[in-house]
Amino acid sequence: MKPFVRHIIHALLAVLFCTGIGFIVYNVRTQRKLVTVNGLKVEFADSLKFVSENDIKGFLASNYGAYIGQRLDSIKLRIIETMLESRSAVLESQAWTTEDGILHVRITQRAPEIRFDNGSEGYYIADDGYVFPLHKSYTADVLSVHGNIPSMPTSSYKGLAPTSEQRSWFSQMLEFKRVAYSKKGPAKKIDSLWVDNSGDLRLRVANEEEIFVFGAPEQLEDKFAKIDKYFAYIKPLK
């Protein structure tokens, strides 16, 4: 077979192959346009309980509108993600559809580091200092601070604390928790922690009766070391 004939045959085969692939892609896209959403599947990336599957379904129904029965290619996935991420307890969301007509939503909840509550006002802060409201029926298992806590503008406030002084204090409290939980002695086992009327931290260690006036959340290593030394050397002599 002459070379130019071979080249022509190869070219024709390539054209036929590309045409076939194009037809398959076109057919798949055409079929996809005919598929409508018939269900919603919600999954969570963590074990927190700030939002539930029913919460997500209700939120989408109220804010996005009808999606069941809509064509897959008409679902505005980015809008859904943005809506869900407007909720204070949702850190990130991902939305996608599959050929079986299911709208999938994956939720990553905002993880709290410290809970603040004085009985009439309360909120969480995350590791970046983001403030978000307490949940009506779920309490995260994190360090809790009571008493004379900083006041937020509203009970539903979310975002960084409104004043630089509050943001600085929250940053110190996050460092307080990190240092406390890194300890191996009794100071690690904080049972109660509150802010008194003077703004000083006071704490009680689990299974102990002593109340320690910790003061401002600074000089952390030295203060925690003193608490540990008290239980190691002073209390046994009493």
Regions found by a protein language model. Name each.
Residues 37-55:
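Short extracytoplasmic/periplasmic juxtamembrane "stem" segments immediately C-terminal to an N-terminal membrane anchor
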